[in-house]
């Protein structure tokens, strides 16, 4: 679909939604294009988006689409309702500094291994929201050359972990054809080859869809690296992987992290771990809390100015709440709901930005060819596939699809601009910050949190020896070598799951049922 046509559809959809008053029923958000932002790619007739260039730190005129009325999800829910809708097409002459000035806290939650089309593609295909999602015409060839199309998944569990390492990801990309997902999955021994072409629906991920309806959905947030977890998480924390393409420690390189820069500037910060403290593999040993501490700090209004929160990572027989196959998406929804509601109920809500994103695509199909960016290492100029990303808060645009190009370095770019930090790398200055997600109209009038649907989960089986070689096995081994042994990992995982479910129930967004 050409960009001009997509813009026309978005405008028409927004008008229709306004006439029908759907937003008042809490049934989602529409999208109307604003031409003002950086990183807009062009689209072709088959629904694939073309290359897009990255710019410097984004200004307040960053591009967005949407403009429908934000609403609550209704039913069994918690939180305030009735927030004012954003005018996603409204121009602004405010720059990034002015937009970020009222922000006092930034919380970053990074989940695992899902692509944008896999998570949110059905917003376009099944619900008609005018975002860069699925059209239903997307296909990949199988090993015999037969077309395998996109289709709705029927279960919240994908048992077999699709390949997503450096080589596999580049084969899936195939110089922008994005046609290697099924063949790579098959070559890896997948029992159901078409699973990587499957997409989730609102019924399977109601929390994520409610947040996407009512806050800033970033439809062009790319993984920083076309490769696996560690390099992408390094870019979130360090704005570089030091040239690392694999899941291996880089502590010997002595690279500074965003936490170091914040410490230097006197900005309070903390890393909240669930079971596997990722920061250990690049040498950070201080300023580490547990997920239970996050809930306590949010409730008390004592969160640091900047924090990164990790879920229970699936590894070493632990089935986490991180969305990494074979983890159950329902547990991930409970985790996201609990983190969101902890902030929604916190006295810090009005001046906090919550960023929810995923480390990389996890081998799941996405139709948009990733663009390039600026990097000191030529092989790392190529971005990875799109990942789900939502920016949330009282000052954030409501129901808007943000078309500015982001990647994980956008977090460091935002913190660097907000607190006048020394940039970690040159890439920080060449990457858009998140100011285009903020609504100038809400700077002096932060909006109340939107209610979430109740997430009902069965009490999980946290450990499964049959899954010992699944998930973050390299991280589990690295943490064991650094003194966080297998027993400690399992104790931490059990405590973290318990904390999330306990707080989720206390906050009114999770209900746990026991098996008969």
In which residue ranges do the predicted regions lie?
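A broadly tuned "polar low-complexity/structure-edge" signature
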Residues: 18, 26-36, 170-171, 180
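N-terminal pro-sequences and low-complexity stem/linker regions of secreted or lumenal proteins
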Residues: 82-516
């Amino acid at each position: 679909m050409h960009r001009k046509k997509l813009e026309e559809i978005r405008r028409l959809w927004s008008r229709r939604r306004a006439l029908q008053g759907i937003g008042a029923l809490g049934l989602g958000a529409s999208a109307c294009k604003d031409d003002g932002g950086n990183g807009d790619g062009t689209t072709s007739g088959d629904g694939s988006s073309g290359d897009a260039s990255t710019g410097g730190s984004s200004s307040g005129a960053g591009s967005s689409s949407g403009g429908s009325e934000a609403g609550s999800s209704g039913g069994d829910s918690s939180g305030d309702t009735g927030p004012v809708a954003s005018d996603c097409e409204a121009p602004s002459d405010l720059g990034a500094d002015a937009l970020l000035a009222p922000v006092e806290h930034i919380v970053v939650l990074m989940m695992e291994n899902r692509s944008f089309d896999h998570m949110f593609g059905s917003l376009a295909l099944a619900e008609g929201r005018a975002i860069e999602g699925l059209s239903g015409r997307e296909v990949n060839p199988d090993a015999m050359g037969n077309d395998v199309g996109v289709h709705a998944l029927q279960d919240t569990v994908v048992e077999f972990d699709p390949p997503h390492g450096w080589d596999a990801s580049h084969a899936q990309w195939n110089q922008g054809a994005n046609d290697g997902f099924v063949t790579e999955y098959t070559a890896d021994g997948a029992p159901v080859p078409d699973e990587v072409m499957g997409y989730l629906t609102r019924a399977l991920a109601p929390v994520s869809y409610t947040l996407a309806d009512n806050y800033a959905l970033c439809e062009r947030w790319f993984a920083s690296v076309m490769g696996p977890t560690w390099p992408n998480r390094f870019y979130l924390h360090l704005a570089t992987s030091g040239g690392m393409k694999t899941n291996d420690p880089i502590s010997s390189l002595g690279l500074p992290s965003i936490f170091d820069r914040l410490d230097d500037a006197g900005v309070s910060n903390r890393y909240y771990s669930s079971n596997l403290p990722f920061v250990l593999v690049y040498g950070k040993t201080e300023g580490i809390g547990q997920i239970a501490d996050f809930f306590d700090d949010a409730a008390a209004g004592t969160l640091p100015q900047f924090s990164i929160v990790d879920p229970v990572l699936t590894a070493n027989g632990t089935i986490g709440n991180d969305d990494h196959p074979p983890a159950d998406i329902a547990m991930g929804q409970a985790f996201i709901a609990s983190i969101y509601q902890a902030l929604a109920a916190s006295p810090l809500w009005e001046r906090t930005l919550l960023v929810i994103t995923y480390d990389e695509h996890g081998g799941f199909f996405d139709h948009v060819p990733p663009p390039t960016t600026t990097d000191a290492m030529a092989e790392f100029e190529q971005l990875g596939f799109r990942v789900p990303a939502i920016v949330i808060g009282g000052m954030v645009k409501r129901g808007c699809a943000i078309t500015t190009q982001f990647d994980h370095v956008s977090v460091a770019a935002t913190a660097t601009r907000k607190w006048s930090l020394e940039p970690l790398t040159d890439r920080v200055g060449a990457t858009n910050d998140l100011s285009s997600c903020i609504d100038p109209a809400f700077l002096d009038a932060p909006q109340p949190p939107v209610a979430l649907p109740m997430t009902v989960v069965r009490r999980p089986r946290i450990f499964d020896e049959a899954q010992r070689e699944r998930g973050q096995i390299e991280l589990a081994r690295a943490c064991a070598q650094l003194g966080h042994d297998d027993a400690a990992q399992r104790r931490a995982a059990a405590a973290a799951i318990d904390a999330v479910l306990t707080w989720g129930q206390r906050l009114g967004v999770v209900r746990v049922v026991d098996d008969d």
